[in-house]
Structure formats: C-alpha cells, structure tokens
Amino acid sequence: MLKPLLSLTGGLITTMALGIAQAAPLSQEDVSVAEVLRDRALESSDAYSIVESLTVEVGPRRTGTEGDERAVAWAQDKMKAFGFDRVYTEQIEVPRWIRGHAHAEVISPFPQPLVVSSLGYGAATPAGGLTAEIIEFPDVQALLKAPASQVKGKIAFINKRMERARTGEGYGPAAQGRKLGMRAAAEKGAAAMLLRSVGTDSDRFAHTGMMSVDDVENPVPALALSAPDANLLEAMLQRGKPVQVKLDVETERLSDGPSFNVIGEITGREQPEEVMIIGAHLDSWDEGTGALDDGAGVAIVMETARLIAELPQRPRRTLRVVLFGAEEIGLVGAKQYVEAHVKELDNIIAVSESDFGAGKVWRFDTRLPESKFDIADQMMQLLAPLGIERGNNESYGGPDSSVFVARGVPAFGLYQDGTDYFDYHHTPNDTLDKVDPENLRQNVAAWVVMSFLTTEMEGDLGRVPTASE
C-alpha cells in the first residue's frame, strides 16, 4: 500500500516514530497512510467548496419542503461525482408543516414591536391574532409547577438565559423550555407561549427549533423572542405594570410525507460487510441557509470519504456516509434507519457524526469497551498534532449517532469548539460567512484519521452497553 501511496502523494512518507508494537490493532503502515491523509487534508482539503455549493445551490432545507427535495438530489450527485462505489437513498416518513407569518407587539403599557420566530410545528393564532397579558417564568420548571389558575388565558413567557461554553453545555438546560414549554402552557390553559431564544448572541434574530408537539390536545401558538426583545420584555415587566402583547401567527400542519436518508459507500476490500458509519444531517431550519447546522458537517464527512476513495486501494472495511433526513424535528431519519437495519447493527463497527458547526476540533471522546482503548490511544498520536486532546469515554457520537449507541454500537466523538456556535444556531444568521475554511480543513484532517484507521484496524471494537442495560 505504501508504494502506490508514495506515487499518489508525490512525496516521501515519513515513517512515524510512534513506538507502536506489532501486536497493536493498527499497523505502522496504516498509521503512516493515515498521517499522509491527515496532512493532505490540512493542505488541500476542499470541504469548503462542498458547503458553499450546498448553501448556494440548495439553501434552506427544512424537512418536507422543496429545499429538502433539492438537497437529496444534490447529495446524490456530489457522492457520485466523488467516486463513491455505491450511492442510494432510503425513504423515511416525516411530519410536514408550513411556516407562515409571525408578528408580535407590545400593546401596553409601552407599545413596541417584538422580533419573533414561530417554533417548529407550532400552532396559529385565531384569525386577526390574539392579545393577552404576559406572565413571566424564570424557566420551564417554574411554569410546570405553577397553578393553572395563574396561567390560564395569559401568554407564558419563559425567560431562561443560555450560558456560553466551548462545549455547548448550556444548550440542554435552556432548550428544555423550547421542548416542554408549549405543552406545559397549553395544559394550563395559556393563550400562547413566548420563549427567550435558545442562543448566546445579542443579535436581534430569534432562534427557531423543534418542540414536543405530539399528543398535545389543544396546542397554542409558541414563539421564540430574540435576546434583545426578551430583555425589553423583562424590563417592561420590572416596572410593575401589566404588559399586554398581541400575537398574529399563521402556520399549517400538513399530512405526513416522504423524505430520504442519502447514503454513499466506499466498499471494503476484505470485510465489506463490516461498516463504519460517519454521518451528518442534510436537513436544516428554513430561516438561514444551514451553513453551520449542518452544512459544515455534511462537507466534513463527504470530504473525508472522498479523500479515502482517492487511495490506491479501498479500506479493509466499508466506509458508509449517511446524510440523515429530518434530524431537526426529532432524529427521525436516524430512528427510522436503525429500525430498518436492526438486524445489521452487529456489523456496524462504529458510528460518528459531525453536527456542531465548523469550529476547530479540540477533544476526542469515545464510547468503547475498556479493552479497546488502545485503538483510541493510537489515534490520539495522530490527532494530538492537530491541537486535539483526549476526552472521556462517554461519547454518544452526535445526535443521530446516539440512536445507534443506544443499541450498543461503539462511537467516536470529535468535538468542535462551540463557543460561538449558538450565536447563529437556528437563526437567519446561519450563513456561509460563518464557516472558516482553515477550521474546516482541520476538521477533515481529524475525521480522515479516525475514519481510515477504524476501517483498517485489526479485530473489532466489540459492543457497548445499550440504553436498557
């Protein structure tokens, strides 16, 4: 393998003095090839052109829309052009929804407009809108504990700020309000729900996102407020006077329809039935162009596979790129994929997903049996020069990947710097100019090391405890 690779790269492969024993799961030859792939990614990876193409030629890709359909066709064309051995789609059934207009304004005591966005699959107001008094809650837990008599007929305002962190760990607590707030408001007889946007910015853009809407008997309108408008509403309430807000929202829930997971494979040369899945999600919300969420991830995993496909011979095992559909509305594509392939899960040796923007990878986590830590240790010797540190063994691999991990599939997690990711997440500001080409190359360099070495290793990675164990 080394001799053909020498001619492919046009340069000398430096043998790495890693001190790796012959009994290790990765041969010195495999490590050397991975080193070359890593360096090629840093020097000449063209992942940026992939995300540029997706955002310019397709744009927003909300599930069940024409943009979603265009994205599926775009992804198939790209994979075929990149020389993947097999490109195909698998249909999934998805709920569909139309976003219409959303207007909000303070009527009294200080009339002012508010910048809002309908939350995903939310309800409309009656024709002509509705006007009601605001009642504020510091978080969704406070709303859940409030007596219905306190909430009935009012607009419940959940005013939970998200904390900024490189790990994005503030997202989960803040997103609980978006997930559960409308349901809680509806059950207590509220007229509507307003939510401080789940984000870390101070821009006057609202952050949309999905809610828990299934089985809500009488859903009410639910809107995200931009951070400055949430601050404004908070300041008005602090003056001690009742605050009346008018909402005028148009949405429509449609019948379920089709979407697709798009799949491309580099077929293994020796053990093609054994598969590593690297994934991203193809859908996006509709108010930006989905450059960070998850156009960058799409570009990273597609470019990773393209670089491996250019090698003189195929990897030992199959590398499968899965661009999941309908992630934004509840991991629908991943869940339906796992159910459709449940008998094949034992052949999936590992899974990983890129779905956290385009910041530099700074940490490498795993979800492996302890007996398999040696493979991660060997990978780290190639990842460390990229500025990546070893993390923990609690990775879920990414949102879609978590569905596989729950069934016992091992996972790798290449975690990106998310310090500013939630400034743009689910907003009109999620656009191509937020993607740094140099950071994208560093991502691909890390991904190609992890992906190639996993497909080439001796032995397997075993299984991890399932969600029920």
Regions found by a protein language model. Name each.
Residues T65, V115-P221, T289, R390:
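Extracellular/luminal Protease-associated
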Residues S7-G19:
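Bacterial N-terminal signal peptides
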Residues R306, E310, F422-E469:
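His/Asp/Glu-rich mid-to-C-terminal helical/loop segments that flank catalytic regions of hydrolases
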Residues L26-T65, F205-M210, D283, S354-G359, ...:
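N-terminal capping segment at the start of a domain
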Residues L180, D201, P258-N261, S284-I375:
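Acidic/histidine-rich catalytic neighborhood of metal-dependent amide-processing enzymes
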Residues E29, V33-V36, E52, V56-I155, ...:
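Noncatalytic luminal/extracellular "stalk/propeptide" segments of secretory-pathway proteins
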Residues P111-P113, A132, V220-L223, A230-N231, ...:
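Metal-dependent peptidase/peptidase-like ectodomains
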Residues V31-V33, S108-A148, M211-A291, E303-R316:
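Soluble metallo-hydrolase cores and metallopeptidase-like ectodomains found primarily
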